[in-house]
Amino acid sequence: QLWKSFRDFDPSRPVFTEAESNRIGRLQCPPSLWRRLGQGRVVLVDLPLKERATLLAEDYQHFIQNPQSLKDTLDGLRRLRGHDQVNRWHQQIDSGDWPSFLESILVDHYDLAYRLPGSEDSVYPKPSHSLEIPSANSADFEKAAADLISQYP
């Protein structure tokens, strides 16, 4: 399915990708494609933390509906993030404090796992500019997408 998507791209038009790692789930990005992604222009897209947490809550409803499964998954992070941090996450989940948990998992785990574009150990160059998205509503996303597309004719 991933290959089919790549194959359908028009090489004369810009392609926008998220600056992720060279793995997509269990799939490994081909080295030649990974190198090519690192040669592209980088735009830092920024969304406020509370809005990012809202998106997580929408996208991961299965964890909110089954908190024990989430806690079991988080237990796998004890060596990486420490017992104190994982215990705090468990407490937030047990008390139903989803906003605090989601913000913490972003700041104290997810964001720490990524290298900033332009940093010494990143494959990506420094961002050429940034794009601020004020909220996670579809109108703001559509406006941001239109703004971005207009800069890359």
Residue map of PLM features:
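Conserved nucleotide-sensing/catalytic segment adjacent to the nucleotide-binding pocket
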Residues: Q1-R35
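Conserved NTP phosphate-binding and transfer environment spanning the P-loop NTPase/kinase superfamily
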Residues: R35-P153
